[in-house]
């Protein structure tokens, strides 16, 4: 807002710099296979298979799908002997590092290490007599050169901790994790990552804040039992956004009661939204209102489906009227403002052509490819429009 002379109108508020993320918290560095975890490396995205681990083909197929979706590290359950027996084949054939998830039976920790898994996650709250086995675990992991994640969950805290605190408070989660880490350190083993998960994002965030202040271990962020896709996405986004913006967090796993590929999509978008991961194709669209002269929802879905396979850093805007067109979407690389059966196609805020509504999606595809080529961006073979749109 300005005066008739062009001078800005002051509102009595001090000028404030644009908000920036806090620097990454300095941690020790770990290698999970070929993926670095710690403050010297980008924040990685993990998921967990939902197959029966002993079904090697099904598990490897799902790992391949996760890899194609951008998963950096994958975790597999190991509840039974048949699952432990499948680990060598899975670890050998997986295109990304495999972490074995161990509960209840300590013998499976050694099976996972012998199988060539890139790391092991242990839950000290439910592994039988775990404290007494730490020395053996530390030696085996140290000899194999792999890290251990101490994964503390609110639902399975050690009995001693529950007796002290009465419930899974942030302090209880942190004390449990650091106690176990201390046992490993006493054995000369320090390649440790920690997670302190709770299904309440507020408690989870506070637990990680306390843990970050008291240690230099790399932290695996997660909201346990987050729920169905929508609810879990909200919980994880709120919690991860809060922590990552403070520089806390080195690897993340979005837990959803959904296809694990969706976990990767959400995790990737969280990191992209915080500029912690190189942006890919981003579709922005207006929420629609009474001015809209086109079905914005359907058009946005069609554009998203058509461009989904293009792994290029372009922001494409879909606007329902000329009011929200090039002006409000001026930061977009490419976009459309629709009205009266037509679409104004704009590139970086400038209208370049007007096309019939039936040609909007096709034109956006053409312009996206042109922009990518002009920027010297490589479009992966097979990328680009994945569906054919007809109106």
Curated annotation (Swiss-Prot):
Alphabetized GO MF terms: 4 iron, 4 sulfur cluster binding; 4-hydroxy-3-methylbut-2-en-1-yl diphosphate synthase activity (ferredoxin); 4-hydroxy-3-methylbut-2-enyl-diphosphate synthase activity (flavodoxin); iron ion binding
Cofactor: [4Fe-4S] cluster
Record-linked InterPro entries: Dihydropteroate_synth-like_sf, IspG_bac, IspG_bac-typ, NO2/SO3_Rdtase_4Fe4S_sf
Reaction equations catalysed: (2E)-4-hydroxy-3-methylbut-2-enyl diphosphate + oxidized [flavodoxin] + H2O + 2 H(+) = 2-C-methyl-D-erythritol 2,4-cyclic diphosphate + reduced [flavodoxin]
Binding site for [4Fe-4S] cluster: 286, 289, 321, 328
Top-level division of the source organism's lineage: Bacteria
Family under the similarity heading: Belongs to the IspG family.
Protein's name according to its UniProt entry: 4-hydroxy-3-methylbut-2-en-1-yl diphosphate synthase (flavodoxin)
Originating gene: ispG
């Amino acid at each position: 807002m300005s005066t008739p002379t062009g001078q800005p109108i002051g509102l009595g508020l001090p000028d404030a710099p644009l908000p920036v993320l806090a620097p990454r918290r300095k941690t020790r560095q770990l290698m999970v296979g070929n993926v670095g975890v710690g403050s010297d490396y980008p924040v990685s995205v993990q998921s967990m298979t939902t197959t029966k681990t002993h079904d090697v083909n099904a598990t490897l197929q799902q790992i391949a799908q996760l890899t194609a979706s951008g998963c950096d590290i994958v975790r597999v359950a190991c509840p039974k002997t048949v699952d432990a027996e499948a680990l060598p084949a899975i670890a050998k054939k997986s295109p990304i590092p495999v972490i074995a998830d161990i509960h209840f039976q300590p013998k499976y920790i050694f099976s996972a290490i012998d199988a060539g898994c890139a790391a092991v996650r242990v839950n000290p709250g439910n592994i039988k007599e775990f404290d007494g086995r730490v020395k053996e675990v530390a030696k085996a992991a140290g000899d194999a050169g792999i890290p251990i994640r101490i994964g503390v969950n609110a639902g399975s805290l050690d009995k001693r901790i529950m007796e002290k605190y009465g419930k899974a408070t942030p302090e209880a989660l942190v004390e449990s994790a650091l106690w176990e880490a201390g046992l490993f350190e006493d054995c000369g083993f320090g390649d440790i990552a920690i997670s302190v998960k709770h299904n309440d994002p507020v408690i989870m965030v506070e637990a990680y804040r306390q843990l970050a202040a008291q240690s230099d271990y790399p932290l695996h962020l997660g909201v346990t039992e987050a729920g169905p896709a929508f609810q879990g996405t909200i919980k994880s986004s709120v919690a991860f956004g809060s922590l990552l913006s403070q520089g806390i967090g080195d690897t993340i796993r979005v837990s959803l009661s959904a296809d694990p590929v969706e976990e990767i999509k959400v995790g990737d978008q969280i990191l992209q939204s915080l500029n912690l991961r190189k942006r890919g194709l981003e579709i922005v669209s207006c929420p629609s209102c009474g001015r809209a002269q086109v079905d914005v929802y359907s058009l946005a879905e069609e554009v998203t489906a058509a461009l989904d396979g293009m792994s290029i850093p372009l922001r494409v805007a879909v606007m329902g009227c000329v009011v929200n067109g090039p002006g409000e979407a001026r930061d977009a690389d490419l976009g459309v403002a629709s009205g009266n059966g037509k679409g104004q196609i704009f590139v970086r805020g400038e209208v370049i052509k007007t096309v019939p509504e039936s040609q909007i999606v096709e034109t956006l595809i053409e312009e996206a490819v042109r922009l990518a080529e002009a920027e010297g961006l490589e479009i992966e073979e097979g990328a680009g429009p994945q569906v054919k749109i007809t109106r």
